[in-house]
């Protein structure tokens, strides 16, 4: 996947660089499986989001509770990918699954 200089900078400056790279690799595999091809901008936004998720996981912080009804139109595939990513990061609430899922909608 082609990444912007900004995305590469986020990765390079991440306090969780190795874990971030692992999560990105996992996402790349899932995107290929589901024929999802993000733009450079979408990748940059996603990588920034993942970096923030890793920080929250490490600091044991949570996001505000989300209304899951707002995500009822999100595909099962997007939710499944998100669930796997949230579980692989660990120490995050299920609300993260729904917020992350929008990155995988086509």
Q: Where in this protein do the model-derived segments appear?
A:
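A cross-family "folded-core" feature that marks the main globular domain of proteins
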Residues: 1-106
């Amino acid at each position: 996947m082609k990444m912007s200089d900004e995305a590469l900078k986020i990765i390079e400056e991440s306090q969780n660089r190795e874990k971030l790279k692992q999560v990105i690799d996992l996402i790349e595999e899932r995107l290929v499986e589901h024929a999802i091809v993000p733009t450079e901008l979408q990748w940059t936004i996603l990588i920034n989001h993942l970096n923030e998720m890793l920080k929250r996981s490490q600091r044991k912080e949570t996001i505000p509770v989300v209304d899951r009804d707002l995500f009822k139109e999100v595909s099962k595939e997007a939710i499944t990918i998100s669930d796997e990513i949230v579980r692989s990061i660990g120490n995050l609430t299920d609300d993260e699954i729904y917020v992350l899922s929008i990155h995988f909608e086509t």
